[in-house]
Design a protein with these regions (language model features):
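N-terminal organellar transit peptides
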Residues: 1-97, 104-192
Length: 192
C-alpha cells in the first residue's frame, strides 16, 4: 500500500486521503516517496495547503493499518484545529494509530465502510536497555494507553474503563470491531 496524502479541493470541499503506515518515513516504504505522506512532518506541510484552502468541509479518507501513535496524535490534533466541518471515513483494515486520526471528525461525522474492520489495542513498542530503562518504557506505555482510552471516551461519550477493557483484550492486542460494533461503541457514527 502506498502512503500518501492527496488533496482534492474545490471551493466548498477538500478531500484528504491518508494511506499507509503512519509515522514510518516514506523513503523506508517506497521507491519514489516524494508525493507520499505517512509522517506528521509531511502531513504538516500538506496541512499548510489545506489551511489556505479555507474549505468549509474537509473529508479525510483513511486506509491505514496504523503506525506511530505520536504521529497519529499530532495529525489528530492538527485536523481538530481546522475551522471547517471534518468528516473521517474508514476503509479496509483501519487499525491502531489510524483509529486515533479517525476520532478527529466533527460531531456526527465519523464514518466507516460496511466492509471495514476497526482495531483498538494497547500500545506497543520495541525496546532494549537496563531494568530502569525498561521500567520507564512500561510506564510510558501505560500513560499512552490511558491517553488513547481517554481520547476514545471523550469522543464517544462512553466511560474510559470500557475502552481500557477492550484495548486490553487478547493480552493487550485488543479486538477487531465490526462496523456495527464500532457504531455501537460510538467510535463511529455511520456505517455505509
Amino acid at each position: 500500500m502506498k502512503s500518501e496524502i492527496q488533496i482534492h479541493d474545490r471551493a466548498d470541499l477538500c478531500r484528504i486521503e491518508i494511506e499507509g503506515t503512519i509515522g514510518v518515513p516514506e523513503e523506508w516504504q517506497f521507491e519514489t516517496p516524494d508525493s507520499r505522506v505517512a509522517t506528521y512532518e509531511r502531513f504538516r506541510e500538506t496541512l499548510g495547503r489545506i489551511a489556505r484552502i479555507e474549505s468549509p468541509e474537509v473529508i479525510v479518507e483513511i486506509r491505514s493499518t496504523g503506525g506511530d501513535v505520536n504521529d497519529a496524535l499530532l495529525i489528530h490534533d492538527a485536523l481538530r484545529a481546522l475551522p471547517g466541518r471534518i468528516t473521517t471515513r474508514c476503509y479496509g483494515y483501519t487499525a491502531s494509530a489510524a483509529t486515533i486520526i479517525a476520532q478527529a471528525a466533527s460531531p456526527g461525522c465519523r464514518e466507516i465502510s460496511a466492509n471495514a474492520l476497526y482495531l483498538i489495542h494497547n500500545s506497543i513498542c520495541a525496546s532494549e536497555g537496563n531494568a530502569a530503562e525498561l521500567a520507564a518504557k512500561v510506564e510510558l506505555l501505560r500513560q499512552t494507553d490511558a491517553r488513547i482510552a481517554g481520547l476514545y471516551a471523550a469522543r464517544s461519550g462512553r466511560p474510559v474503563g470500557e475502552f481500557e477493557v477492550l484495548m486490553a483484550e487478547n493480552n493487550g492486542n485488543g479486538r477487531w470491531l465490526s462496523p456495527e460494533e464500532a457504531v455501537g461503541l460510538s467510535l463511529i457514527h455511520i456505517s455505509e
